[in-house]
Amino acid sequence: MARHSIKMIALLTAFGLASAVMTVQAAERIAFIPKLVGVGFFTSGGNGAQEAGKALGIDVTYDGPTEPSVSGQVQLVNNFVNQGYDAIIVSAVSPDGLCPALKRAMQRGVKILTWDSDTKPECRSYYINQGTPKQLGSMLVEMAAHQVDKEKAKVAFFYSSPTVTDQNQWVKEAKAKISQEHPGWEIVTTQFGYNDATKSLQTAEGIIKAYPDLDAIIAPDANALPAAAQAAENLKRNNLAIVGFSTPNVMRPYVQRGTVKEFGLWDVVQQGKISVYVANALLKNMPMNVGDSLDIPGIGKVTVSPNSEQGYHYEAKGNGIVLLPERVIFNKNNIDKYDF
């Protein structure tokens, strides 16, 4: 009888130890979700996230929907929560569409962060932000102004969708800057490629054909910008200023051929790394309130800013924005220094 009791205690002890190990492993799993898979920009961000995971000894899973949809992202969020992931970092396709799922996840103790494209601030803890809407909207207009030296000009905006958070915030600021600083510029159209390469090319060609006297296309989207450049080449429009945001590896041939003089972005690999380091800080219960800083190896210090930096009115403890240290304008003189 005593021998049987000893065996039972040993089994229970072993089971308890195994459970503890499993719990530790589960607490070290982070999901990193893009708007969709198969786009170089998001893949690069995922690479940065997974590199940070390896450095920290954390299992980082990169996965996203094949199309940019709320339902696809919600399904992934729910799956990761049910699998016991401890943190989820998502580039949201909608500011509010993911909120019910994200709030449920937070109620279950999952740390929720956003990167690239934000939700409403009450639906996450921190947004790893490439730049404020004012910074990025100004950057778009300034790049166009470097090439459009006419007082009166015709400009088109072309990006992913009318509902995506980040790009619409940038475009709103860009249009306001045009109204204030370039009142002679006419915004002739705003169109969307819906993160589809084929549709983006068709839309870009349609814009150029519909407005033969167009002076500039502003395309703050990783699919729309190369599509606009390719459309200009297909239609032999050499005198069109094409600016926006995309990755240097995608845009390099257009810059080398002179179709695109300059375009902008930020180091998205760095953005992925910062996202995971911030999530890890939350998992380790490190102080992460407004004004607190985090030292990230190879990157430097990042600081938590209030949500008001993004134009929000919501502030709470353990909630804010972490801005990337810098943004980059790429041209033929510096593009070969970057590989992502």
Curated annotation (Swiss-Prot):
The UniProt GO MF terms for this protein read: carbohydrate binding
GO cellular component terms?
ATP-binding cassette (ABC) transporter complex; outer membrane-bounded periplasmic space
Presence of the UniProt keyword Signal in the record: yes
SS bonds (residue pairs): none
Location within or outside the cell: Periplasm
PANTHER family reported in the protein's UniProt record: ABC TRANSPORTER PERIPLASMIC-BINDING PROTEIN YPHF (PTHR30036:SF7), D-XYLOSE-BINDING PERIPLASMIC PROTEIN (PTHR30036)
Descriptive protein name: Autoinducer 2-binding protein LsrB
Native organism is Salmonella paratyphi B (strain ATCC BAA-1250 / SPB7)
Organism placement in taxonomy: Bacteria, Pseudomonadati, Pseudomonadota, Gammaproteobacteria, Enterobacterales
